[in-house]
Regions:
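N-terminal beta-propeller domains
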Residues: 1-99
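Small/polar beta-strand repeat architecture
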Residues: 14-19, 94-253
Length: 253
C-alpha cells in the first residue's frame, strides 16, 4: 500500500529536520511547478547561448524590453560597443561620434600596410575605431568597397526585418557599414528603409544581412539594381593632432 506524502512547495533550511516535517529541507537546481492541482519539484531547464557571436569588450549593462509590435529586444552595453539583439542577431548600434569628407588625405608607403590619414583636429585616440572608404585606390589600396547589386540581390523574409543581400566577394566584415542608393521596394519594405546606412552582419563571402525598420509583408527577391558603398572598420594605431594611422589588409604597391 502506498501513502501519498503531501509535501508543500518551498525549502526550509533554518529549522531542524524534526521541525521541518513535511517540507523540503535540501534541494539543488529545482523549481516547483503546479501539475494537476498539486505542486511538484521539477528539474530547472538548461541554458543555451543566445548567440554564437562574441562581444567586443566586457559587458557593463543589459536591458530587455518589447516594442509596440511585441518584438523581443535586448540591448547590451560593453566597454567597446553597444549592441541590440533583434531577430536572432546582435547588431552593433554604437553611435558614430563624427563624420567627415576628406580630399587627397590618404598617404601610403610602398610595401607597407600602414596608411596615414591627414585629418585636421580629428580628436581620435589610439584604439578608436573609424569607418573608411576611398573612391579611388591609393597605392593600390582601397579602404572600403563599392559596387552595384545585380537584380534580385535583395531578399526579404515574410515577417522579418532582416534583409539578405547577395553580392559575390563583397569584401565586408561583420560590423562594417554599408549604404545603399537607388534601391526599389521589395517584399513590402519601402525604398526609404533600404536606401540608408546599415550595420553589416556577414554570413559568408557572398552573403550579408542588414536590419531595417520595417518588417517584410512577403518573401521576395527584387529591389532593382542599387549601388552601394561599404565603409570598412579600422582601429586607429598611432595619432597626433592632425593625422592618424590604420593598418590595411595588404601592403601598398
Amino acid at each position: 500500500m502506498f501513502v501519498e506524502l503531501p509535501i508543500v512547495p518551498g525549502v526550509i533550511t533554518d529549522n531542524s529536520d524534526l521541525l521541518s516535517e513535511g517540507r523540503w529541507i535540501d534541494v539543488d537546481k529545482i523549481r516547483f511547478e503546479a501539475i494537476g492541482g498539486k505542486s511538484h519539484a521539477q528539474v530547472i531547464g538548461g541554458y543555451e547561448d543566445l548567440s554564437e557571436t562574441d562581444f567586443d569588450g566586457k559587458g557593463r549593462g543589459i536591458h530587455r524590453w518589447a516594442n509596440l509590435a511585441s518584438e523581443e529586444l535586448v540591448a547590451v552595453g560593453t566597454t567597446e560597443r553597444v549592441y541590440i539583439f533583434a531577430q536572432g542577431i546582435f547588431w552593433d548600434i554604437t553611435p558614430i561620434r563624427a563624420s567627415a569628407t576628406l580630399t587627397d588625405k590618404i598617404d601610403t608607403t610602398d610595401t607597407d600596410a600602414t596608411v596615414t590619414v591627414d585629418h585636421t583636429a580629428h580628436g581620435l585616440l589610439t584604439g578608436a575605431r573609424v569607418y573608411l572608404h576611398n573612391d579611388t585606390a591609393v597605392g593600390g589600396l582601397s579602404l572600403g568597397v563599392s559596387g552595384t547589386l545585380a537584380s534580385g540581390s535583395i531578399q526579404t523574409i515574410e515577417g522579418s526585418k532582416t534583409l539578405v543581400i547577395t553580392e559575390t566577394a563583397h569584401g565586408l566584415a561583420t560590423n562594417d557599414r554599408v549604404t545603399f542608393a537607388s534601391a526599389t521596394a521589395v517584399g513590402g519594405v519601402g525604398a526609404g528603409a533600404i536606401n540608408t546606412t546599415h550595420t553589416v552582419y556577414v554570413v559568408d563571402a557572398n552573403t550579408l544581412l542588414v536590419h531595417v525598420a520595417t518588417a517584410a509583408t512577403s518573401s521576395a527577391a527584387a529591389g532593382g539594381t542599387p549601388t552601394y558603398i561599404g565603409l570598412k572598420e579600422y582601429t586607429v594605431t598611432v595619432v597626433d593632432v592632425d593625422t592618424y594611422t590604420v593598418e590595411a589588409a595588404s601592403a601598398a604597391t
